UniProtKB/Swiss-Prot annotation:
UniProt-annotated location(s): Cell membrane
Annotated InterPro entries: ABC_trnspt_W-bd_WtpA (IPR022498), ModA/WtpA (IPR050682)
Domain of life where this protein originates: Archaea
Similarity section: Belongs to the bacterial solute-binding protein 1 family. WtpA subfamily.
Swiss-Prot/TrEMBL keywords: Cell membrane, Membrane, Metal-binding, Molybdenum, Signal, Transport
Record carries keyword Metal-binding: yes
GO molecular function, one term: tungstate binding
Subunit comment: The complex is composed of two ATP-binding proteins (WtpC), two transmembrane proteins (WtpB) and a solute-binding protein (WtpA).
Name this protein carries in UniProt: Molybdate/tungstate-binding protein WtpA
GO cellular component: plasma membrane
Amino acid sequence: MIKRLIVISILLIVGTVLCGCMEQENVGQQNSEAQEKIVLKIFHAGSLSVPFEEYEKMFEKEHPNVDVEREPAGSVACVRKIIDLGKKADILASADYSLIPQMMMPKYADWYVMFARNEIVLAYTDKSKYKDEINSTNWYKILQRPDVKIGFSNPNDDPCGYRTQMVLQLAELYYKDPTIYDNLVLKHSNIKVEENNGTYLILVPKELDVDTNKLFVRSKETDLLAPLEAGAFDYLFIYKSVANQHHLKYIELPKEINLGYYEYADTYKKVALKIIAKNKTINAKPIVYGMTVPTNAPHKKEAIEFVKFVLGHPEVLENNGQPAIIPAVAYGNVPEELKDLVKIEK
């Protein structure tokens, strides 16, 4: 009897040890699998957050060995992370394609693709003052009322912010009223404007200083959504796609000033903006998104595959209010894997 108990005890101990070894082996395999997963890092414009979240889920489903990590910010800030802070990203997607050739090429990028369009609208909520009175013809008069507070993103950090300045300066030309931009921004900030033979250069200082009683400013446009919905300010200049994605009410601005139409490119270019901190001058132009794989991207193969995936599924952009450019237009040393999906310009 005693011998049987001893044998049983030994068997139980051996079994426990074996189970523990098997569990450790399984955990080790799981950890190994997790470690083998490729982390694809994407720096992208805040206005691409909704469609890129969809792309992330779709891409990961088809590529289970890839973990897509997105880091949204103002497009200028995204670029600076790479060229100034030395951070590495597998993909850079900007709300202004021109930032890639102007700031990244040739050292940090040698090609880019223009893949989607947008336009600026004036968004508001049920809490906004004069919401029942404002329309597409009197909006600029409503905004000038003393008790109305407007919001836009920082022109130093975000294309939506500097495009807002361009839109308001263009509004002066369109409505033939030289006081619009002055009353809405210049009198309430340290932004300046220089006029030369019918063209205008907006000067944005390194440190933006605004009258917070009139202007509400944050780094990128998506940072302004929650405060707008909470009633912290009344009206927000933002991309039409973002307004649609967040179910905001909005006023459509005239085509001649909303930066959304190629046929008005000559009108838009009457205005330019200089970011003094970077000594960069940006001409107003139709809003076009750009994307590239930086030259120092850690996972170029997977990054190019993601770009190819985006270009192959334009319906995601279309469904989120950002018309896709079909075929996408590409410049530079375009990867072979993308050449069948793009129109290459010299």
